[in-house]
């Protein structure tokens, strides 16, 4: 009996190890492949789609339309950097100062403040499931290091802008621009880009199509930050265009 149990344990352990290695292989292949190829869909898109189907909503479709950085207004890249990660060109995937501030804030507040960089958000949205856990955070850190090592900053920003969620079923800046402004992403103004960036903390709660007072205030704050960073010159200076 003990031999049978031991044998079963060994088989299960081998199976688990193979599964882990297979997932790691897929992630490594994805990092290498998506360094040059358009991303057809992200883990978040798949999760949202299956969640809708399982809840009986068969009308939901996760829409996305890949575009290159040359087809995205420079204001859009600047807006998300101003809103989400102002040290994006300098760090290697993690903003240590922001993490320290978030930890100090979270120790004394009920409202949780995040400190994820654009690189971390890209890794999470592209490869991982939604939610909060130490396991997911650990995987996110490893994947972030992977894309920071293999991809350029321009590539990270390109992928981020193409898979970010901007509303219910709206993924990527091209889809968002067409949906909310009836124009391609290449023609977004600074104000429109700031409005899209303003909903990114919670695109299912905040609406670009019907912006609340909070979203409008955040839009104006983002515009001020964009000017302080140096406007379009910031993007050229850091070779993000």
UniProtKB/Swiss-Prot annotation:
Annotated source species: Cronobacter sakazakii (strain ATCC BAA-894) (Enterobacter sakazakii)
Entry's Gene Ontology BP terms: cell wall organization; peptidoglycan biosynthetic process; regulation of cell shape
Gene assigned in the entry: mtgA
Compartment(s) of residence: Cell inner membrane
Assigned protein family: Belongs to the glycosyltransferase 51 family.
Pathway membership: Cell wall biogenesis; peptidoglycan biosynthesis
Record-level Gene Ontology MF annotations: pentosyltransferase activity; peptidoglycan glycosyltransferase activity
InterPro entries noted in UniProt: Glyco_trans_51, Lysozyme-like_dom_sf, PBP_transglycosylase, Pep_trsgly
Protein name (Swiss-Prot/TrEMBL): Biosynthetic peptidoglycan transglycosylase
Biological role: Peptidoglycan polymerase that catalyzes glycan chain elongation from lipid-linked precursors.
Cross-referenced PANTHER family: BIOSYNTHETIC PEPTIDOGLYCAN TRANSGLYCOSYLASE (PTHR30400:SF0), MONOFUNCTIONAL BIOSYNTHETIC PEPTIDOGLYCAN TRANSGLYCOSYLASE (PTHR30400)
Pfam families per the UniProt record, alphabetical: Transgly
GO terms for cellular component: peptidoglycan-based cell wall; plasma membrane
Record's keyword terms, sorted: Cell inner membrane, Cell membrane, Cell shape, Cell wall biogenesis/degradation, Glycosyltransferase, Membrane, Peptidoglycan synthesis, Transferase, Transmembrane, Transmembrane helix
Catalysis performed (reactions): [GlcNAc-(1->4)-Mur2Ac(oyl-L-Ala-gamma-D-Glu-L-Lys-D-Ala-D-Ala)](n)-di-trans,octa-cis-undecaprenyl diphosphate + beta-D-GlcNAc-(1->4)-Mur2Ac(oyl-L-Ala-gamma-D-Glu-L-Lys-D-Ala-D-Ala)-di-trans,octa-cis-undecaprenyl diphosphate = [GlcNAc-(1->4)-Mur2Ac(oyl-L-Ala-gamma-D-Glu-L-Lys-D-Ala-D-Ala)](n+1)-di-trans,octa-cis-undecaprenyl diphosphate + di-trans,octa-cis-undecaprenyl diphosphate + H(+)
Membrane topology designation: Single-pass membrane protein
Domain of life assignment: Bacteria
Enzyme Commission number(s): 2.4.99.28
Chain ranges passing through the membrane: 19-39
């Amino acid at each position: 009996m003990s031999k049978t149990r031991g044998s079963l344990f060994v088989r299960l352990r081998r199976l688990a190890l193979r599964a882990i290695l297979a997932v790691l292989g897929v992630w490594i292949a994805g990092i290498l492949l998506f360094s040059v190829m358009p991303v057809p869909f992200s883990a978040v898109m798949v999760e949202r789609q299956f969640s809708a189907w399982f809840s009986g909503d068969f009308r939901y479709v996760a829409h996305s339309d890949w575009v290159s950085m040359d087809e995205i207004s420079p204001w859009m890249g600047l807006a998300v950097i101003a809103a989400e990660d102002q040290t994006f060109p300098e760090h290697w995937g993690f903003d240590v100062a922001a993490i320290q501030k978030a930890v100090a804030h979270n120790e004394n507040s009920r409202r949780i403040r995040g400190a994820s960089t654009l690189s971390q958000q890209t890794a999470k949205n592209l490869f991982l499931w939604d939610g909060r856990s130490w396991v997911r955070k650990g995987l996110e850190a490893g994947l972030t290091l992977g894309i920071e090592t293999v991809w350029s900053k321009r590539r990270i920003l390109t992928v981020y802008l193409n898979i970010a969620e901007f509303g219910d079923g709206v993924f990527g800046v091209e889809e968002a621009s067409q949906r909310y402004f009836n124009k391609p992403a290449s023609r977004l103004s600074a104000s429109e880009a700031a409005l899209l960036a303003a909903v990114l903390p919670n695109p299912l709660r905040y609406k670009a199509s019907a912006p609340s007072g909070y979203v409008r205030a955040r839009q104006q704050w983002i515009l001020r930050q964009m000017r302080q960073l140096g406007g379009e010159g910031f993007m050229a200076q850091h070779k993000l265009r």
